[in-house]
Design a protein with these regions (language model features):
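Flavin-dependent oxidoreductase catalytic cores
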Residues: 1-344
Length: 344
């Protein structure tokens, strides 16, 4: 986890089965769950049926989910996110006719996609504040153990980092230091609200989807990692996505260049906690944990195996997942969501 599941009703409290989904996967005490990307403000949204964390109704619904996870003796972080240029302009207008479609620069996330307007400095500051408020709502009101800033997969923080989406000529774009400025200010604002030991960030240096895939991400992500380590000795973790995962697609080994690894982040960040995600099996996960000391995140396998932790411990084969049921916006049936079987 985290995995986008689009089962939430955007303008109403979360569906009750969302609680079942998380509680099912928290049944082994000590499990750490990270929610799917949860939007920090209406202006930061982008498509229907994603979870949100700004109204009292939403906070109350999340509190019930958090309490259910904690009752199992497990932990849960909220991944907080903003869409930026990936948002649907029509969806934003359907929520409020004044909501703009914006990004770091006036560049679309894909050929033929709508072109966002370049964010003003006022809008940049506004989004930084959104992240701070979202973190406070999650930790201080809903009771989450911490938050993970979504800085991966072409969402807003990632858009500022990458030269393919950020060609600004002010202090928020251009050099490595300038492209890292917005992510660092988001981190600073979130840390101010909840403390560094309750904050992590997810990064995908090698992701090519959603118009990402800068030619050489190593200098940018090295600088970000170094600065976070220097500024926040108690920062909870960095969560990296392997090069083999490209958005929602798995690349073939021959499509991945030899240098496309996250070892550069791992080496800078050591000995602090690093979470690694990217289609791990039981065997490859254990091998990476043993050889590199990473914490291993499981996403898709956790969808189809609510008792994944037990299966990992006892070497029980994984149940296969059904991709066709990954994303069913607003569905309340539980199909492909809460109906996967536990091993006997």
């Amino acid at each position: 986890m985290p995995n986008v599941r689009v089962r939430s009703i955007t303008l109403s409290p979360l569906l009750p089965l969302v609680k079942d989904y998380y509680v099912q996967r928290a049944q082994v005490p000590g499990t750490l769950l990270i929610t799917e990307g949860t939007l920090v403000a209406p202006k930061a949204s982008g498509i229907p049926a994603l979870p949100e964390i700004w109204t009292e109704e939403q906070i109350s619904a999340w509190t019930e989910i958090v309490d259910g996870v904690h009752a199992q003796g497990s932990y849960i972080y909220m991944q907080i996110a903003a869409f930026g240029r990936q948002a649907s302009p029509d969806y934003l207008k359907s929520r409020d006719s004044t909501f703009p479609h914006v990004g770091p620069s006036a560049l679309p996330h894909a050929p033929g996609a709508p072109i966002p307007r370049e964010m003003t400095k006022e809008e940049i500051n506004e989004h930084i504040e959104f992240f701070g408020i979202g973190a406070a709502n999650a930790v201080h009101k809903a009771g989450f153990d911490g938050v993970e800033i979504h800085g991966a997969n072409g969402f807003l923080v990632d858009q500022f980092l990458q030269s393919t989406s950020n060609v600004r000529d002010d202090e928020y774009g251009g050099s490595v230091q300038e492209r890292v400025k917005f992510p660092l200010e988001v981190i600073e604002r979130v840390v101010k609200e909840v403390g560094a030991d309750r904050v992590g960030i997810r990064l995908s240096p090698w992701n090519r989807s959603a118009g990402m895939g800068m030619e050489d991400p190593i200098p940018t992500f090295s600088y970000l990692t170094t600065r976070v380590k220097e500024l926040y000795p108690d920062f909870a973790f960095i969560h990296v996505v392997k090069a083999r995962v490209d958005g929602f697609t798995d690349l073939l080994p021959e499509d991945i260049k030899e240098f496309e690894t996250n070892d550069f982040i791992r080496n800078i960040w050591a000995p602090k906690p690093l979470i690694s995600a990217g289609g791990y099996t039981r065997e490859s996960g254990m091998e990476t944990a043993d050889e590199k000391g990473d914490l291993i995140a499981y996403g898709r396998w956790f969808i189809s195996n609510p008792d994944l932790v037990t299966r990992l411990e006892k070497n029980i084969p994984f149940s296969k997942y059904d991709r066709s049921t990954f994303y069913i916006p607003g569905d309340a049936s539980g199909v492909g969501y809460t109906d996967y079987a536990f091993a006997q």
